[in-house]
Amino acid sequence: SSFEKAGQRVRLPYSVIEQKQGTCIDLAVTYASCLEAAGLFPLIMIKKGHAYCGCRLEEETFADCVIDDFSAIDKRTVRGNEDILLVECTDFTAGEKIDFDRAVKHGKNNLSDSENFICAVDVRRARAGGLRPIPQKIDSNSICGYDGTVASVSDYQAAAPKKLKIG
């Protein structure tokens, strides 16, 4: 991943796994894609200078795909009333043995810094709103669409419009 003038480039999950490297946002997106593939309800958590992942424990979504209200997230992580489980994804690569419970503790600790909270992205709500995943690369000549169909790269290129009209 690289920093741009505004934002940051994010590696696709297959690149993170293939290259065995990634920034916090790369790891959060990869983990969220694994949660979604398992039928769970991922949240990508973004705070100033860092990203990590969460998961809704109940089958429901927020009203919008981007949640910038800290209290809407925080109140769902209170012990005994937990609807969201947070995970520090960089713990999976820290080089030392960090178990899942500790990664969850570190994920929850990230939320204790309300001043630096930017937003959470509710992936399930985004899907309900029509946002689809980027097709995943199978090999250099074919990709798999979000619906599981496999097509050659040339098929996707042929289907792309020759020119986009904006405005």
Please tell me what each predicted stretch does:
Residues 1-167:
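A structural boundary/capping signal
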